[in-house]
From Swiss-Prot:
InterPro entries in the record: eL8/uL1-like, Ribosomal_eL30-like_sf, Ribosomal_eL8-like_CS, Ribosomal_eL8/eL30/eS12/Gad45, Ribosomal_eL8/Nhp2, Ribosomal_eL8_euk
Keyword terms of this UniProt record: Cytoplasm, Ribonucleoprotein, Ribosomal protein
Predominant subcellular localization, coarse grouping: cytoplasm
Protein name: Large ribosomal subunit protein eL8B
């Protein structure tokens, strides 16, 4: 036989021969009994029996309820968030227009005061500031007046009723909008802990092209799919035990 080649396995498999090893008569096998009050139980995943802190318990219950119950399309649309790459580009643009901090504002006003004292206009000392707009009522009024160029909505606002109408309002007014994962991430854009919404009303000339590109990508994911998303309900997914029970019932009905 040529070197490197293996013999084909037997078609029906070779019968295994039992090894007759000599056993030590002094040792006895002691199979474990895992019944109640018997041997120490093997390690298992017991996280579902843990008594979690109340805030964790509420988070878990809320998550499970949103999966089990049927969720109307208006609320279910908040589970479709902006993809990671587009979100990174969006945050990169918005970070250029973060509102000024108290120290930055003080410095700007000092420069303006010095310029006015020298007989110049305050525009010479500091150019017009561009900033991200935030605050629910403020952003809603900007959308209604069609001043917002891009609106970001957080997907985890509680209660959700605060922002549930915003996608419909943006669609009606023709304002581009995107649903972003995490109100805390929006908060970083406006120097706050959290923010339900953030909007851009105007950008500098050098960022116009980047904004236009972002808007076209975001519209393809949200505004253009709005009518399709309205048709789909969320939730209604059974747990493992309930699913197994349904499968068993279906199997018995098929066999009958």
């Amino acid at each position: 036989m040529a070197p490197g080649k293996k013999v084909a396995p037997a078609p029906f498999g070779a019968k295994s021969t039992k090894s007759n090893k000599a056993k030590n008569p002094l040792t006895h096998s002691t199979p474990k009994n895992f019944g109640i009050g018997q041997a120490v139980q093997p390690k298992r995943n017991l996280s579902r029996y843990v008594k979690w802190p109340e805030y964790v318990r509420l988070q878990r219950q809320k998550k499970i309820l949103s999966i089990r119950l049927k969720v109307p399309p208006t609320i279910a649309q908040f589970q479709y968030t902006l993809d990671r790459n587009t979100a990174a580009e969006t945050f990169k643009l918005f970070n250029k227009y973060r509102p000024e901090t108290a120290a930055e504002k003080k410095e700007r006003l000092t420069k303006e005061a010095a310029a006015i004292a020298e007989g110049k206009s305050k525009q010479d000392a500091s150019p017009k500031p561009y900033a991200v707009k935030y605050g629910l009522n403020h952003v809603v009024s900007l959308i209604e007046n069609k001043k917002a160029k891009l609106v970001l909505i957080a997907n985890d606002v509680d209660p959700i009723e605060l922002v549930v109408f915003l996608p419909a309002l943006c669609k009606k007014m023709g304002v581009p909008y995107a649903i972003i994962k995490g109100k805390a991430r929006l908060g970083t854009l406006v120097n706050q802990k959290t923010s339900a919404v953030a909007a851009l009303t105007e950008v500098r000339a050098e960022d116009e092209a980047a904004l236009a590109k972002l808007v076209s990508t975001i519209d393809a994911n949200f505004a253009d799919k709005y009518d399709e998303v309205k048709k789909h309900w969320g939730g209604g997914i059974l747990g493992n035990k309930a699913q197994a029970k349904m499968d068993k019932r279906a199997k018995t009905s098929d066999s009958a």
